[in-house]
Amino acid sequence: MDIITIIIAVIAGIGGGFGISKFLEKSGVSNLIKNAKKEASSILKDANLEGENIKKDKILQAKEKFIELKSEHEQVILTRDRKVAEVEKRVRDKESQVSGELSKAKKINDDFEAKTNEYNTKLENLEKKQVEVEKMHKSQLQQLEVISGLSTEEAKNQLIEGLKSEAKTQAMAHIQETIEEAKLTAQQEAKKIIISTIQRVGTEEAVENCVSVFNIESDDVKGRIIGREGRNIRAIEAATGVEIIVDDTPEAIILSCFDPVRREIARLALHKLVTDGRIHPARIEEVVAKTTKQIDDEIIEVGKRTVIDLGIHGLHPELIKVVGRMKYRSSYGQNLLQHSREVSKLCGIMAAELGLNVKLAKRAGLLHDIGKVPDAESDLPHALLGMQWAEKYGEKEEVCNAIGAHHDEIEMKSLLSPIVQVCDAISGARPGARRQVLDSYIQRLKDLEEVAYGFNGVKSAYAIQAGRELRVIVESEKVSDDNASNLSFEISQKIQTEMTYPGQVKVTVIRETRAVNIAK
């Protein structure tokens, strides 16, 4: 019983404790709810108050924006009204101006109609008077025909014939007088111009020279230039086409060749070889090639310097090169570049005296002998060849005609043509200017070389020993050793049948085979 009582007591205690705890828990939640409601009420009140403030601010901002937009709109309306007023004013002014112009036009039209009516009236009166005059004229003609016994046509023909005869007589007399006066005046003026031009020219005399002297420091250098068994000197002659003469002349070697360009290349190449000290066939070929390039550059520089000195502009580069090559050419012993410069200056002086184009005259004078400097031999006269070059490189028609006509091969169509012809004669015909011997000698050597070039397989040909020997270098692929002898015979036979020459001409055919490999 006691145990049951205890158990009941325990259960009752547990139940009572649980009830007390539940009561206490319920009482705390109630307080929390009350506090939450208070806080929510306070927050809601604050939110309503803040919302009212925001609402008032927004309403105030909206009112300010409305006032601003209203002001802008009113300003736009005012601006538009002002522009409309200005346009209306311009329209009214334009209408007033147009109205005035219409009034003027109406007045002018009325005046024109009045003048037209007046003109028509005068025209009618004039036509009436013209009819009356024609009637009177016919009446007078009829009376004259009756008196003279001639018809109108017969009288007119007699009068015309008489006037023609008288006019022809007077015209012939006047023409004859004018011709005589022109001849006298032209001769006097031409003499005056030519004398004035000649007096302003002074140049050197012609010099005939086919050799150059290469000075050396000692005779020991001669042996190095000759080389073992003469291989060096043969290599120089083969590379340059110049005959090297080594004789007893102390400290000097003679270079003989009719072509000044070849002589100059040989002289410069020898100078480089002796200065460098390395003289052997391979080095000789290398130096000659470089020297040839150097001479080509120098030719271009000489051409540019010449045209600048003469004040000639716009010349084609190829023509400038031809002008530079004139330095190494001569005509009858007269240096071609000096002659052309002289003719150019003379043409400029004479053109200035005659009131012609000085620049064109100097241009034609400088280029008149470019046909004497051909890249290859041509059958054309040098004047026509020069004219072809000038046309090819864009020179003016007057200049081309002056070049082609200065030896009368073509008709002179330009005023520059006779000027160039006269100035060429002044430069070449004065005492000491030219000598015939050198030019004919050089032409004979050129012809000798051209004979060799006419055969197949010939690479180059050089006339040496004053034309007594012709060295022909052939291509080993085209000419065999057996054919070399036959080629030499054929060339000698052609020279014998086609050319006139003193003494004998030795023909030497040189054939060389080279095998070159490179070790890498």
From Swiss-Prot:
Keyword Kinase applies: no
GO biological process terms held by the UniProt record: mRNA catabolic process
Cysteine-cysteine disulfides: none
Location relative to the cell: Cell membrane
EC number in record: 3.1.-.-
A GO term for molecular function: RNA binding
Gene3D superfamilies: Hypothetical protein af1432, K Homology domain, type 1
Class of enzymatic activity (EC top level): hydrolase
Membrane topology listed for this record: Single-pass membrane protein
Annotated signal sequence range: none
Sequence ranges assigned to domain HD in this UniProt record: 336-429
Highest taxon, organism lineage: Bacteria
Listed GO CC annotations: plasma membrane
Keywords: Cell membrane, Endonuclease, Hydrolase, Membrane, Nuclease, RNA-binding, Transmembrane, Transmembrane helix
Chain ranges of the KH domain: 210-276
Keyword field contains Transmembrane: yes
PANTHER family: RIBONUCLEASE Y (PTHR12826:SF15)
Function: Endoribonuclease that initiates mRNA decay.
Entry similarity comment: Belongs to the RNase Y family.
UniProt protein name: Ribonuclease Y
Gene field: rny
